[in-house]
From Swiss-Prot:
GO molecular function: ATP binding; magnesium ion binding; shikimate kinase activity
Protein name in UniProt: Shikimate kinase
Residues the entry annotates as binding substrate: D36, R60, G82, R140
Species this protein is from: Aeromonas salmonicida (strain A449)
E.C. number: 2.7.1.71
Matching HAMAP family: Shikimate_kinase
Pathway membership, UniProt: Metabolic intermediate biosynthesis; chorismate biosynthesis; chorismate from D-erythrose 4-phosphate and phosphoenolpyruvate: step 5/7
Catalyzed reaction equations: shikimate + ATP = 3-phosphoshikimate + ADP + H(+)
UniProt subunit comment: Monomer.
UniProt key word Protease: no
Pfam family, one: SKI
Organism lineage: Bacteria, Pseudomonadati, Pseudomonadota, Gammaproteobacteria, Aeromonadales
Length: 172
């Protein structure tokens, strides 16, 4: 089996994937990508607009394509969107093309980290944020665990400390 040279960060919104990913890439001298930012770059529109115009299904199609393209590269750190693992194709590509690290966090931390963020379409609904996050956790946690090579709890730890833990875990 070829050595896995990419690192893919998965987990719910507010777990710290983007922030931790930047620290990790810097520490390992790897290129960092955020799938949501790449979707925005390619579409010329922000995520909220994509959700408004194309719905979640249209967004997920774009996300699957972006992650498929990026994961073909070597030597990258990729922070995925929280729902990226809903796609079996995406889960298979992540597993086959790199080391998958599930950044786990509590609902309380997610609420604290996302409460002022208006750029999260799934939280911009009439449904209370706690209920949304609990529902998403029920739908997704088993999928995160299925694809993860490693699981790291991010609550009450700085992004730099979590990045250091990842480096030790994966032996890079």
């Amino acid at each position: 089996m070829a050595e896995k040279r990419n690192i893919f960060l998965i987990g719910p919104m507010g777990a710290g994937k983007s922030t931790i990913g930047r620290h990790l890439a810097e520490q390992l001298h790897m290129e960092f990508f955020d799938s949501d930012h790449e979707i925005e770059r390619r579409s010329g529109a922000d995520i909220g607009w994509v959700f408004d115009v194309e719905g979640e299904e249209g967004f997920r199609i774009r996300e699957e394509k972006v992650i498929g393209d990026l994961s073909e590269q070597q030597g990258i750190v990729l922070a995925t969107g929280g729902g990226a693992i809903k796609s079996r194709e995406t889960r298979n590509k992540l597993s086959a093309r790199g080391i998958v690290v599930y950044l786990e966090t509590t609902i309380e931390k997610q609420l604290a980290r996302t409460q002022r963020d208006k750029r999260r379409p799934l939280l911009q609904t009439e449904e209370p944020p706690r209920e949304v996050l609990e529902r998403l956790a029920q739908e997704r946690n088993a999928l995160y665990e299925e694809v993860a090579d490693f699981v790291i709890q991010t609550d009450d730890q700085s992004a730099k400390i979590v990045a250091n833990q990842i480096v030790k875990l994966i032996g890079m």
